Structures are given as structure tokens and as C-alpha cells.
């Protein structure tokens, strides 16, 4: 059986959940359509997702049509859940991008299409709600060409009056875009030679698979118009990115989820081989796990299975699998474009509204952060505050609501601050000698530090001979330095510098690697005190798409948000602005942009790097370490 994995993506109220229900119903997977209002749909059925109108976590359902099984991966659509978006897109064989015939291309549609193009996912456009009053499809087509891609192939003829009717094109007009994109076909066409349907279909298929052509279909999920045809398109146009025939097992973990009973589930896309119940499987070329229970989606329901084939999405109950873990042979993973996860840029302090719920809050955060790598937290052991780092405002709002709905914990949140970094100001060296108070460790370490250009990261080298100090001691020094770099003089991560291990002394047999591991961060702190450090703040590159009338306001507002506009383009009645902005200003800039353009703008951002800050340094409390803090205090007292 052919197995394909698709995503249905859309802006709010475009009808994504209704379309998914219609696909399940028309294929016979379910016998009754679910209701969004009643929360009986197979996807987006939590109270939180219904209230916000957005998908928050990846969900899975499925249907079977003839000899093809289709897994539908329900994908989040908000920028604050970008890591979840890219993880779920990475397992797709194709996507349906839903566009409301009444609303046209919205800001969120463009963000989703940007992600699909970036990941190289073959995509079909589906114009939904064509049965609503006042629809002008020519305007929607133009909107798509201007804001998404001009390389579309309209596959159907639509009559809106007196009754809505959708029929597939049979004449040659649909092939214009295909012919224009191929020099050989265009030359044949211009010379009057006939073009075979087969060669046109092959060219369309090639360009569709490499994401340079986008077929466009129509319908109404609510009124069941065009759904049967869409099912045929899904099963015929999308190919599975799996290894056929006998091969080694290969699968990738793309989602971690906790059930209401606190069971930990790992979602895995299989790319090759067969996974059997009770198999012992190697994970990321290291330890092995035993498959004790295995589930998959069958006609919209999760069912226990005893084997799963290449292409399938399986769910294992397991305490040890992590996001992006690879089961089996890592070399068999598809070479899809790798997208780096965005870094959390903000942090805040959280506490339960009811102090007696502190342990419940910590348990909940442990589960949520296990599922979402963009949420991190730690407990300050001096102040006992819970420090949470995250990506954006909506993500924090959703986490707060999730804690209340699923875990029954209400929280208080302080005003978020940006996560800074530190860089040494100048070259410096420092050595702490063995048996010289207050050093209690059986180790001598000498370090030097040198600043590097912005964006260089932390570089480490050792000039101490392995012939004198063996690898286990050398590794311990490097581990201690990495730990020390997590907190500079102002409490932030240290970067953009070169640290050299220049001198080491040990006493045999009393010295151990632990002595060197404990002493290294203390020496590092002292050498940083000699060098001094400066604060770096995160900057984002941005690209704004807005109506042309916003151009003058954009330039006038830029200084208010410390934004620097470096490029301006005018295209299709839009202004496209590119530049950079401090991360601390982007939330307000994006909100004001949405307000002044009445929601007709899009702001895409990526981390550009870190720039030196001005003004008073921003400090954060150090995370204490009971094993070395007393020694740190003694050295700080004498230096």
C-alpha cells in the first residue's frame, strides 16, 4: 500500500478543520462529520485551540482511498510555534495550502507559504468557501500571483451562478504556465508543433515536486463541493519520500506528547524498513530501545499495531526518545533542507498564583519543555525563582492558558526581558596554582581569553600536551570552561571569544579530572574579570510586506523602534522593506504594523546576530553551584 503524509495549512477561519473533516467523511474514514463548535472534530479539538482559532500542537489523523493511505498532519500556523511548524513540515510529502475565497491571501497565509518554500514541500493551493456570496475568483487569483507565486496552474473551471459548479479543465489553457516554464516545450509550441498530454503532465509533475509550480483547485468544505476531486488529487499527485523494497530501518522522532495520564508518547516518521512490535532498535547510533507498544492512525482513530512499514507515522510509548532522535540507520534520512531552530529571545519569571502548586507547576513545565525545545526553564537556587525562556508573546500566552486548562495551575508572569550575551573586551590571562590558598582542588589551570569578531562564537584550544595531561583531564577542563561560559560577569552566556588552556599541573595519584572540572570555571571567571566583558543584544533581520501607502510611515516610525531599513522595493501595489531591528523592539513594531495596516501586512524575521549594547548593563542572577560557589567567593574576595 502507498502511504503519503500531507499537511493542511491555512490562516484563521479559512476552514482547515472543516476541510480535514470533509476529507475523512468523503473517504469513508468517519461516518459523521465533527463539529468545530462542539469540539468533536478529529483535529483542533481542545478548548484552547478552539478559543484561539489556531493549531498549537501537531496532530495526526488519516484516511484510506483505494490503495493509498493518507496521514494528515495538522500543523501549527503561528510564528511563535515555528519550531513545531518546521518539525511537522519535515515529515510531509506534500501540503495543501487553504485560501478563503472571501478573505483571499492573508498575512498568515504568506508566512505559511514562506515556510513551505523554505522546506521544499510540494504544495497545492485550494480555494475554499467558493459558495459564499460576493466571491470574485479573478481577484483571488491575482492576489495569489502577487503575494505567493505567479507560477500557478488553475486546474478547474468554476461557475458560481446560478449554482456553484466545479469541473476539471480539458482544454489547453491550463498548460500555459507549464509551457512557458520550459524552453523546449515553448519552442515546440511557438513552431506550431503539437504537444502531447503526457509530456505536459510529466513537466508539470517535475516542477510540482521541485516546488516551482503550484496546481490550484477549488471547493467548499462545508458544502462538500470539490472534496472528492481533491481526494483524487492528493492520492495521485503526492509521492512518498521513502525507500522502497527491503532496507534497513530508519525513522525520525518529530513530536513528543504527554497524555492526560502522563504517558509520554513519541511520534515517528518511518522512512525505510519495517518496525515490529518487540523489536530492539538502535537510537541515533547509540543505545537501543525495545518496542513494547506501537500505535498508528487508522481511519481517524489511534489503533494498536504489531508492525509498521516505510512511510508510516507510528507512536511509541517511551521515556527516553527525544525530539529528532533517529531510529535505525541515520544515513537513510532524506536530505531535506535543514532548518535551524530559532533561539528563545525572551525570558520571564513565573510563579504559581497558589504557592502550594509550585511542584505541580514544575512538573508541568518539565513536560511542556520536553515537547517544545523553544521553552526552557531553570530554578534560581538562591531566590528560588522559576526563570522561563521562550520565543514570543503568543507562545507565552498559550503556555499560560495550557497550564490552566491541562494542568489546572494558574501563574503570575513578570514583564519579559531580552536574553543577552557577553563578549570579553580585551586579551587577558589568569592562573590558579595547586596548593595555593584558597584553591582547594588538586589542580593548576592557566587560561587566556581573546575577543573575536561578532558572530564567531566560542572557540577553544589547548596548548597543554596530551603527553603530560591525558585526555580525560583535558576533557574535564573543556567541560568546566563550557559550564563557566554559561554565566559571564553579568550572568549571561559568554560568546565571540577564544579561550586557550595554556598551563596545567597535577599531582599523581591524588589529582582527578573532577578537580580540573571544578577549577576551570573559577579560573575562567577570574580571567574574564581581568578582560572585562561587554553586553551583546540579539538583532533580527526583517522583511515587511505592506500596502504602498504605509511607506512614509514605515520610514518615520523606524527610529522609534531602533529599526534600520536597508532596502526598499515596490511591487504589485506593495512596499517590501528589509532591515534589522533589536529583538526587544520587534513585538511592539509588529503589533503597531498590524494595527496601522489593518492586518494587511506581514513581518518575517530571523535572528541576524548580536550587536554591542549601549547604556547601563543588564544583569541577571547567577545560577549557584554549591560545589564551587564558596571557592568563587574566596577568589572574588582577594581579587
Curated annotation (Swiss-Prot):
InterPro entries: EF-G-like_DII (IPR053905), EFG_II (IPR041095), EFG_III/V (IPR035647), EFG_V-like (IPR000640), G_TR_CS (IPR031157), P-loop_NTPase (IPR027417), Ribosomal_Su5_D2-typ_SF (IPR020568), Ribsml_uS5_D2-typ_fold_subgr (IPR014721). This is Tetracycline resistance protein TetM from transposon Tn916. One of its GO terms (biological process) is ribosome disassembly. It comes from the Bacteria. GTP binds at residues 10-17, 74-78, 128-131. The keyword Nucleotide-binding applies. Residues 1-242 form the tr-type G domain. CDD domains: Tet_C, Tet_II, Tet_III, Tet_like_IV, TetM_like. Belongs to the TRAFAC class translation factor GTPase superfamily. Classic translation factor GTPase family. TetM/TetO subfamily. Keywords: Antibiotic resistance, GTP-binding, Nucleotide-binding, Protein biosynthesis, Transposable element. The keyword Protein biosynthesis applies. GO terms for molecular function: GTP binding; GTPase activity. Abolishes the inhibitory effect of tetracyclin on protein synthesis by a non-covalent modification of the ribosomes. Pfam families: EF-G_D2 (PF22042), EFG_C (PF00679), EFG_III (PF14492), EFG_IV (PF03764), GTP_EFTU (PF00009).
